[in-house]
């Protein structure tokens, strides 16, 4: 059963995030994050370290400024979906409360009633290596994030809506869709990895074997 935790403000929400693995942290569990290692995530979740203050980080601030506009643009371009946004809600399944997600948008397909997730990305591909990550589709770390969100919600699909700023300054909007039925095997694999990390490493306090993060 889907559980929705509502929090009144960012401070409450940040405190509640410590009770599980968030979607943006899912890739770190399996060494597919370009932002943190599984060891860094373990230290965060066991209270050995505090989350880095990203105030002043240009990429984070760029994304925060553009995210509301991306939601408005999505609604204008895809009126077949109803879009809701709850910035301080945390969603999870009652039998798996440590797999948690706060969504950039909650979608309802108007004709079918299917529920889905909007995931917004605003990537500045300022060098060749960053562009290569997007060249053939969605970077693996973001795929993990989308799988994690479907596990947490039990919903039918994720639409990843991305604004990519290229090396020459031009911008490109991309839309990718993940369907639950096509991802069941990968979702189960990720769920097992996340459960093992949480139950064996976080709850019991056993240090995991280090997995080098992707560049």
Where are these regions (language model features)?
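Charged, glycine-rich intrinsically disordered N-terminal tails and low-complexity linkers that flank
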Residues: 1-65
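Nucleic-acid nuclease catalytic cores
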Residues: 60, 77-103, 107-202
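N-terminal accessory/interface modules of nucleic-acid-binding and processing proteins
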Residues: 42, 52-85, 142
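Phosphate-binding glycine-rich loops and adjacent basic patches that engage nucleotide phosphates
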Residues: 2-3, 25-39, 67, 110-112, ...
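Glycine-rich and polybasic anion-binding loops at the starts of cofactor/ligand-binding domains
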Residues: 163-165, 208, 212
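Alpha-helical structural motif
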Residues: 6, 34-38, 66, 70, ...
């Amino acid at each position: 059963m889907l559980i929705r935790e509502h929090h009144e403000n960012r401070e409450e929400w940040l405190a509640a995030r410590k009770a599980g693995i968030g979607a943006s942290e899912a890739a770190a569990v399996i060494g597919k994050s370009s932002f943190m290692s599984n060891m860094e995530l373990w230290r965060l979740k066991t209270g050995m370290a505090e989350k880095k203050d990203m105030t002043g980080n240009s990429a984070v601030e760029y994304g925060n400024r553009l995210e509301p506009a991306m939601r408005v643009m999505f609604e204008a371009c895809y009126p077949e979906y109803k879009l809701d946004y709850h910035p301080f809600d945390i969603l999870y399944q009652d039998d798996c409360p440590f797999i948690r997600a706060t969504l950039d948008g909650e979608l309802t397909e108007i004709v079918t009633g299917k529920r889905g997730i909007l995931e917004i990305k605003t990537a500045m591909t300022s060098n060749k290596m960053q562009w290569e990550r997007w060249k053939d589709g969605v970077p693996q770390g973001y795929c993990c994030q989308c799988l994690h969100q479907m596990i947490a919600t039990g919903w039918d699909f994720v639409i990843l809506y991305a604004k990519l700023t290229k090396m020459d300054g031009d911008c490109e909007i991309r839309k990718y869709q993940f369907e639950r039925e096509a991802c069941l095997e990968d979702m189960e694999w990720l769920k097992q990895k996340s459960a093992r990390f949480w139950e064996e490493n976080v709850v019991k306090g056993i240090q995991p074997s280090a997995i080098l993060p992707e560049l």
